[in-house]
Amino acid sequence: MGRMAHRSHTGTGPSQRQLRVGELIRRTLADVLNRGEIHDPDLNRMSITVGEVRCSPDLKVATVHVMPLGGKDVEEAIALLSKHRGELRHHITRQMTLKYAPDLRFRPDETFDRLDETRRLFSDETVQRDIRGSGDGDED
């Protein structure tokens, strides 16, 4: 029990700490962007949603998934956020006590695209037939 009790997280998913830090970073960035605390008129005119933040196991890299309202100008939003990455990191370190300020990497949030694809799959006639067929209880 001694060796196994101190084993680090080796599962396929993120650890609780990664999830907790990612959520704190997400909230902090969303608040900063919502209040317009970054001094760039082009960035402040955009309404950007911070959908998810995924942290590396060592918490030194945070991948921030963002989407402008309406889904337009995604590349411009990512370029502007990347341009102000240092200022955004500064806001994060003021709000959180971490040993290292994570390097922020911005990516488009594809959650809604995946949701649309899932809906499309479930509405497919073949899938509907399989779903109805599996709920009959005819299996022996």
UniProtKB/Swiss-Prot annotation:
Keywords carried by this UniProt record: Cytoplasm, Ribosome biogenesis
PROSITE patterns xrefs: RBFA
Entry-linked Gene3D superfamilies: 3.30.300.20
GO CC terms: cytosol
GO terms assigned for molecular function: ribosomal small subunit binding
One of the protein's GO biological processes: maturation of SSU-rRNA
Localization in the cell: Cytoplasm
Entry keyword annotation includes Cytoplasm: yes
Chain ranges passing through the membrane: none
Record bears the keyword Transmembrane helix: no
UniProt subunit comment: Monomer. Binds 30S ribosomal subunits, but not 50S ribosomal subunits or 70S ribosomes.
Homology family: Belongs to the RbfA family.
Annotated HAMAP family: RbfA (MF_00003)
Cited function: One of several proteins that assist in the late maturation steps of the functional core of the 30S ribosomal subunit. Associates with free 30S ribosomal subunits (but not with 30S subunits that are part of 70S ribosomes or polysomes). Required for efficient processing of 16S rRNA. May interact with the 5'-terminal helix region of 16S rRNA.
Name of the protein in its database record: Ribosome-binding factor A
Organism: Cereibacter sphaeroides (strain ATCC 17025 / ATH 2.4.3)
Organism lineage string: Bacteria, Pseudomonadati, Pseudomonadota, Alphaproteobacteria, Rhodobacterales
